[in-house]
């Protein structure tokens, strides 16, 4: 069985909200959140990261420190939020409250204007995870990614219905274990 640990990037310079494909840098606090999360964790055989700098910059640092191979995986990018990118929920409540409510109630059924459908996001993330599982069978990977990627994988691993996806909470710099079964499905690891 392939063991996959998921690490969410730390706090970013532009703050929270719908960051999506925006390429924000980490704050010093964000760097520290990630360093603290991996302290004493591992060992890993391979590091895999989203190419966005809030993930990849830390991945490069950790790979150099630990002498590990690093693979940047474009399909582990965050969900693209279209017209909502760079905005937060409070801002959207001013002019898009109904749309935001539809997204929160059914993220698979409502796509933000100009955004990536969640079913498409899910497909690319699951293909990427299955590819990693096959390529690195039996190894332990650290995957540095985004809240949306982690929510998706953790919700599936926990057997949650799709409409409960947004109930999965993942903090900045949170490290969570996952495994990939021989069939490729994410499986929760008890912590």
Give names to the regions the model predicted.
Residues 13, 54-56, 78-80, 149-151:
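Short, active-site-adjacent cap segments at secondary-structure transitions
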Residues 3-68, 72:
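Active-site-proximal alpha-helix that buttresses catalytic centers in soluble enzyme cores
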Residues 161-185:
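Domain-level recognition of soluble alpha/beta enzyme cores
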Residues 41-43, 132-139:
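Glycine-rich phosphate-binding loop signature in dinucleotide/nucleotide-binding domains
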Residues 64-124, 167:
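Phosphate-handling substructures
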Residues 146:
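Short basic (Lys/Arg) and small-residue
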């Amino acid at each position: 069985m392939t063991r996959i640990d998921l690490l969410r990037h730390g706090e970013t310079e532009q703050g929270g909200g719908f960051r999506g494909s925006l390429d924000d840098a980490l704050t010093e606090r964000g760097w520290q959140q990630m360093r603290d999360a991996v302290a004493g964790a591992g060992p890993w055989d391979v590091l895999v990261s989203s190419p966005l700098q809030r993930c990849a910059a830390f991945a490069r640092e950790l790979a150099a420190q630990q002498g590990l191979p690093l693979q940047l995986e474009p399909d582990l990018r965050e969900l693209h939020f279209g017209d909502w990118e760079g905005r937060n929920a409070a801002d959207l409540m001013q002019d898009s409250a109904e749309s935001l409510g539809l997204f929160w109630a059914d993220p698979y059924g409502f796509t933000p204007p100009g955004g990536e459908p969640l079913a498409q996001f899910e497909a690319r993330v699951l293909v990427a995870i299955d590819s990693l599982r096959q390529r690195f069978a039996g190894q332990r990977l650290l995957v540095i990614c985004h809240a949306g990627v982690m929510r998706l994988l953790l919700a599936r691993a926990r057997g949650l219905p799709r409409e409960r996806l947004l109930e999965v909470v993942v903090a900045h710099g949170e490290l969570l274990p996952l495994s990939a079964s021989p069939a490729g499905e994410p499986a929760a690891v008890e912590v």
